[in-house]
Amino acid sequence: MRRLAVYLAIAVGLFAQAPKEGARESLAEKADEAGNKAHAAEEEGSMDIWKWANFLILAGGLGYLVGKNAGPFFAARSAGIRKDMENSLAQQKDAEARAADVDRRLANMEADIAALRGEGERAARAEAERMEQHTAAEIAKIQQHSEQEIASAGKAARMDLKRYAAELAVELAEQKVRARMTPETQDALVQGFVRNLK
């Protein structure tokens, strides 16, 4: 607490003296300013001459550099512009030629479409004719194969019929032989067979 009171007392003392010192400084400054203004006015007159001299030297140097480099710069610039214009004209002619080619193609497009349609119809007819010929050939092959199968089936049926007829004939002959065969005839046959084996 004591410290705070001491600090406040010092601060009040300093502020009380500050206006007095500020007043002294402002009087001294005003006197210096008046002297400086007079001296500055004398120096300013001589400085204006040097400023103009520096300006004239700078303007002359810039004028010399511009005069020396401006001619070639503008010549190169105009040559570049001329070249760009020539390129533009060439591109314009190329674009016009392409546009004329497109117009010509568009004009011929109807004829091209009609030609393509005619060619497509001819190709379709040729394909249909080829398909008809192929179908006729396939039908002929199928008929020939069917005829061969029918002939083969007929031959097999005839063979089966002959075999069946032979089997029937054998059965009939067997029945006839059995009907004629008596036990005495059978014994005589067996004994004759046994004798032949010896």
From Swiss-Prot:
Keywords associated with the record: ATP synthesis, Cell inner membrane, Cell membrane, CF(0), Hydrogen ion transport, Ion transport, Membrane, Transmembrane, Transmembrane helix, Transport
Localization per Swiss-Prot or TrEMBL: Cell inner membrane
Top-level taxon of origin: Bacteria
Protein name: ATP synthase subunit b
CDD domains cross-referenced by the UniProt entry: ATP-synt_Fo_b (cd06503)
Membrane-spanning parts: 49-67
Record's function text: F(1)F(0) ATP synthase produces ATP from ADP in the presence of a proton or sodium gradient. F-type ATPases consist of two structural domains, F(1) containing the extramembraneous catalytic core and F(0) containing the membrane proton channel, linked together by a central stalk and a peripheral stalk. During catalysis, ATP synthesis in the catalytic domain of F(1) is coupled via a rotary mechanism of the central stalk subunits to proton translocation. Component of the F(0) channel, it forms part of the peripheral stalk, linking F(1) to F(0).
Record InterPro entries: ATP_synth_b/b'su_bac/chlpt, ATP_synthase_B_chain
Membrane keyword on record: yes
Family note: Belongs to the ATPase B chain family.
GO terms for MF: proton-transporting ATP synthase activity, rotational mechanism; proton-transporting ATPase activity, rotational mechanism
Main localization, broad class: membrane
